[in-house]
A protein has these predicted regions:
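Boundary/linker segments flanking structured domains
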Residues: 1-56, 60-194
Length: 194
């Protein structure tokens, strides 16, 4: 399946109809990601060949550019299980007749499957820069909670299905401008999926 990967800053969404025209957004390339090689938070929206846009994931990182590039590789199916890797011990010696396999991480497995079902993806950068270093985890939680991001996990998955999951803690100190930006995106998103 051919994929489309785009990126946009949340600040630019006032002038862009995110869910109806992604052609005007930047393609994800090494060059377009250069300004994102820092702390930040992003939201991933995806669309199947037939259907509406869905909020798939929210993430935060000390280098969101590198993380998004890695996610694109996973979604594209570029990261595969590696089989038959020669075992090299701590002394730099190959151990004859010993090989091992490197399997995909749970994140890579999920993204690989998502990439088989969805063909269009937009990463929205909520915030980017060193000033968000201490706040990024709280912003991620707030955005994921508000969007109910389909594949988001706060550290680990639940072992059993639950109802009425409570609002995450530590979100009260998020700057009002960031909260308002997220709330406005959620409003537009909810109007889109109705």
């Amino acid at each position: 399946m051919e994929h489309v990967f785009k990126i946009v800053n949340a600040d630019d969404l006032d002038s862009i109809d995110l869910f109806n025209n992604i052609d005007n957004l930047k393609d994800i390339t090494g060059e377009s990601m250069a300004g994102y090689m820092t702390y930040g938070v992003w939201i991933l929206f995806g669309r199947k060949p037939v259907g509406v846009w869905e909020c798939l994931q929210v993430g935060q990182s000390s280098n969101i550019g590198s993380e998004i590039i890695s996610d694109v590789k996973c979604l594209s199916g570029e990261i595969k299980t590696k089989e038959g890797i020669e075992y090299i011990n701590q002394f730099g010696q190959k151990v004859p007749n010993y090989t091992y396999n490197v399997y995909l991480s749970p994140r890579e497995q999920i993204y690989e499957r998502v990439g088989k079902e969805y063909n269009k993806f937009v990463f929205v950068c909520i915030c980017c820069g060193e000033i968000y270093k201490d706040e990024k985890k709280a912003i991620e939680k707030y955005a994921a909670w508000k969007f109910r991001a389909l594949f988001w996990r706060n550290g680990g998955s639940f072992k059993e299905a639950k109802e009425n999951v409570q609002e995450p803690e530590d979100i009260e100190n998020i700057k009002p401008t960031i909260k308002n930006s997220i709330d406005n995106m959620v409003k537009k998103y909810n109007e889109h999926i109705k």
